[in-house]
Structure formats: C-alpha cells, structure tokens
Amino acid sequence: MNIRLILLFFIVSTASASTKLFILGTGTPNPNPERMGSSYLVLANDEPYLFDFGTGVIRRIAAFSPSWGGDYKALEVENIKHAFLTHIHSDHTLGLADLIITPWIMGRTDPLKIYGPKGAKNMHKNIIEAYQPDIDYRIYGTQPQNNTGYNVIFTELKDRFIYEDKNIKITALSLIHISEPTRPLTI
C-alpha cells in the first residue's frame, strides 16, 4: 500500500469527527492468521468507502457492525456500495467474491460500484460465472434473494480519475508497484 495513501487517510480521519478510518487488513500473500489481506475502509458521514478487498474483508467489516457486536450501523455489510481497487494482486483482491455475494445475501439491493484498474472487470465476470449456480439457487430457491444486489457497476480507473460525492473526493494516480501498474488513490 502506498504510504502517501495511508498518510492521507490519517489526515482525513482527524479532519472531522464524522470521518473514520478502519484498517481491515495489512497482510501480504503469506497466510498469516493474525493479519487479513490488504483492505481499508473510510467511513465519511456514515457512508462506507472500501479500498482494496483482501482475504477476510467482509468478516472484518462485519466485526464493526451491531449485528456482530460492533458499534457502527453503517458497517452492516449490506451497506457497502463503493469499492476501490488500487491494483490486481491477490492480497488486494481475494475477498472480491465475498464482497459481491455476502452483502447481497445479507440484503443489499443496489449493485456494488467498483472502481479499479484494467482487468478488474474481467475478475468480476469470472466470479459471477463461477457462482452462477449459487446465484440462481438464491434467486429462485426456497428463500429467494433480490435479483439486483449481486450485480456490479464497474468503472475503470485511469490516471487522474476522480470520484467525488457529497462526502469524499478520490483521485487516482499512476505508479509502478513490483513491476505492475497500480493506481494509488488520494482522498
């Protein structure tokens, strides 16, 4: 993770009582049981914004929600609607299937919005293809789910891409990380 991004997270988290940073995982591809895959969440005015989604991301978010003993209603997993991916390394992406499927099972009705580099859209397509029998079962089975909450609206991050809403402004930059292009994000 780009240190500049982490420092900006801390600046944002201290700028307002209504903005908080949750460090969900700082792990590497190595299976350390004490560290989940790379993932951070900024909660701005009770709207969650997820950055990278390594292994265990949904369980870590759920731990902060009242359903699982936490204090942040906004972090019920079905409330995750925005996810940003900096680059396609396994320690940043292995939680993608869980991010798509579990919040939908828990009641998310709106499609998840993912902003990521080239290749991330194909990852989503392959996950949906792999889980299609389960999705069909959940839509048409004995306990039907909605037919929209597992969908994803994907936007490819390009240099100087800007996402902005009433709570947050995010800009994508370009750099090389271990010989791979990456999109560090400033907030």
What is each of the regions a protein language model found here?
Residues 1-8:
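Sec-dependent signal peptide recognition
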Residues 10-50, 57, 161-173:
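Zn-dependent metallo-beta-lactamase
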Residues 21-23, 111-115, 123-126:
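Non-globular, low-confidence helical/coil segments that flank catalytic cores
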Residues 30-32, 106, 179:
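Short glycine/serine/proline-enriched coil/turn segments at secondary-structure junctions
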Residues 35-37, 109, 149:
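Extracytoplasmic
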Residues 45-48, 55-115:
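Active-site metal-binding motif and surrounding structural segment of the metallo-beta-lactamase
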Residues 117-175:
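Metallo-beta-lactamase
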Residues 176-187:
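Single conserved hydrophobic/aromatic residue that forms the stacking wall/gate
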